[in-house]
A protein has these predicted regions:
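Non-catalytic nucleic-acid-binding/docking modules located in mid-to-C-terminal regions
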Residues: 83-215
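Short amphipathic alpha-helical molecular recognition features
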Residues: 7-11, 30, 34, 51, ...
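Noncatalytic, basic helical substrate-engagement surface that gates or grips nucleic-acid strands
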Residues: 1-36, 41-45, 67-69
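Positions that flank functional sites
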Residues: 38, 61, 208
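Short secondary-structure transition/capping segments
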Residues: 43-46, 65-69, 130, 212-215
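Short, hydrophobic/aromatic alpha-helical segments in well-folded domains
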Residues: 41, 50, 122-125
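Long, highly charged, low-complexity intrinsically disordered interaction regions
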Residues: 34, 46-116
Length: 215
């Protein structure tokens, strides 16, 4: 546990403010919701057509019924830097021959942020069980002698379903506070070098690479 904790990052207000400052200098529009999971909020924005895609490495996002997900944009292990993975939610569940409710049960059964993994049930077994029994409730009723489900598992499942639908049909697009700004290359350069203390040569080289107007 201690070893894994070294790889975790606690998101503080200071980090959030730094990200906002960076986005402002870069001229990237952003929305900062007051509460809730970012993937949940972004997935609903995509579902209602406010954004075209959600960019994330967290595959739990598909459990929010995110219509279009882009992954591997920041995966440094990939040799090709011009390739990303795009997941189409509707095509995916159609290909799996699952309803949204069944796919959500499958995701929860595999283990997620809100529900633990059930011993001896991996992705392949979870899919077989969902295909056979359709719901987690039916799976528990018919296989409790074979699998050991955690205490209060059904309550955790129901809580997970609430969380995965937390923003569904609850975002008023007209009242969203979209923060916008013009790109400020000199401001960005000074911020990265003086405030973030990045190497000046690296900053200048990167800015020239990604912004043709920068001299």
């Amino acid at each position: 546990k201690k070893r894994l904790e070294k790889y975790t990052v606690r998101i503080t207000k200071e980090i959030i403010d730094d990200v906002k400052t960076l986005l402002n200098f870069m001229g990237v529009p952003y929305i900062h919701p007051a509460e809730g999971e970012g993937e949940a909020f972004a997935s609903e924005l995509c579902r209602v057509g406010y954004v075209d895609y959600v960019l994330t490495e967290d595959m739990d996002t598909m459990a929010y019924a995110c219509p279009k997900l882009i992954r591997n944009c920041v995966d440094k292990s990939l040799k090709r830097k011009d390739i990303v993975s795009i997941f189409d939610y509707q095509k995916m569940i159609d290909g799996l021959e699952l309803s949204h409710e069944q796919f959500l049960d499958f995701c929860i059964l595999c283990g997620c942020d809100y529900c633990p993994v059930v011993p001896k049930i991996g992705n392949i077994t979870a899919m077989k069980l969902i295909k056979n029994y359709k719901t987690i409730e039916n799976i528990i009723e018919n296989t409790s002698s074979k699998y050991t489900f955690p205490e209060n598992y059904l309550k955790m499942v129901n809580d997970a379903k609430i969380n995965f639908n937390i923003f569904k049909d609850k975002i008023n697009i007209d009242s969203l506070n979209l923060n916008t700004s013009e790109i400020n290359i000199e401001g960005l350069k000074n911020y990265l070098i003086n405030d973030i203390e990045m190497n000046e040569k690296r900053v200048v080289t990167t800015l020239k690479k990604y912004h043709n107007n920068y001299k």
